[in-house]
Amino acid sequence: MKKRYESLDVLRGLTVAFMCIVNNPGSWAHIFPPLKHAAWVGCTPTDLVYPFFVFCMGCAMAFSFSKYEKATSKAYLKVLKRGALIFLVGFALNLYPFFPTSVHDQTWTFGQNYLYWLQHKRIFGVLQRIGMAYAIAGCLALWLKKPGRILAAIGTICVAYTGILLIFGRDPGAFTLEGNVSMRIDTWLVGGDHCYHGFGGTNFDPEGVLGSLPAACSCLLGYLIGFMIHGSQKNMSALCQGSSHEGSMPSEAVNYSPDRVVNRTFIYGCLSLILGIVLSIWIPICKPLWSVSYVFYAGGWAMLTLAFLAYLLDVKGYEKPIVPFKAMGMNALMAFVFSGVIAKSYGFFGFAPARYFGANEYLSLLWSLIFASVIFAILWVLYKKKIVIKL
C-alpha cells in the first residue's frame, strides 16, 4: 500500500464518524441542537460535515494528481469518469432497494406502480454533488496547475455564482428558499418530481446543479492545502537525500518541516474563516445554497482541524489514540455507501429505531453511536486486511 498522509485520513475518519452520528438518530423528533442542520441560514457543527468531506477529497486530489507531469486527455477522462462513477453510485443509493416499498395505488398493476415510483425518484444527492464537484475541481486543477491560478479560479467562480443568484433571484430575496434561482434551474433540468421536497414541500434541491460550482471551490481549497503539504514533503525528502551525502541537513529544511506546514495550514485556515465571516455580512452563511461565505467559513474550519491533527500526529507523534479514525478515513466514500444501504434496509427486518430509541434525545444519540460503531466495525475489518475500496 502506498504512503498516505495520515492526518488527512484521520480528518476524513472523524468526518465519517460524525456523519454516521448526525444522519442516523434514533428519532428525528429528538435530536440535540448541535446535531441538527441549521434551518436555512447559519452553521451548526452538523453543517460542517459535508464541506469537510469535500475539502478532504480536494486535499487527496493534490496527492493523486502529483503523478501527472502535464494535463493529458487521458488524465481529464479519468477525472470525468471517476466523477461520473461517484454520481452513479449516489443515484443507485437513491434507487435502493430498486423497487417500491409501498404501493401508490392498489388498483394499479405492479408495472404501473413501479413506473410511478421511478417517475418520482430523486436524481441528486450527497454523492451526486461530490461527483460533480470532483469533476469540476479536478479538471480545473489539471488545467490551471499553479496555486495562484487555482486561487483566481476560486474567486472567479465565487463571484460568478453570487452574481447569478443576485441577478436571477426573485422576491423575497436571492438568498431565500422561495426566491433563489437554483430551485428553478433544477426544476427545469430534471422536473420537480425528481427534486428533493424536504424544504416545505418545495422543489428546492440542496444538492442541485448550480450549487455544485461553489462546492467545487470547497474542493479546490482542499487541493491548495494538499498541494502545499505534498510540495513540502517532496522538498523535505529531496533535502534529506542530499544531506545523507553531505553529512548535514541544509538550513532551508526548516521551511518544509512538519511544524512549519502546520503553521501555514493554521494561518490559511484563520484567513479563510475570517473571510467567510466578513462575507456573511452581505452574503448569508447558507449550507443549502452553498453560499460563498459558507465556502470560506467551512473551509477555514477544515484547515484549522487538519492543522490540529497534523500537529498531534506529525509534530507530537500521537498516533495510537486516533488509529480508529484513520481506519474510517481510508474508506470514507464506502463508509457513506455502507451507512446508506444499512439505514435503508431496516424495513426488511421489521426494525424501526424510533420504536426503541425514540423516547428522548439521549436514547436517540445512543442509537447514533451504535450505528456508527457498526460502520466502524466494517471499516476496521477492511483496514486490518489493508483493503482500500476506491471509486
What label would you give each PLM region?
Residues 1-238, 243-245, 250, 255-391:
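Alpha-helical transmembrane segments and their immediate juxtamembrane cytosolic regions
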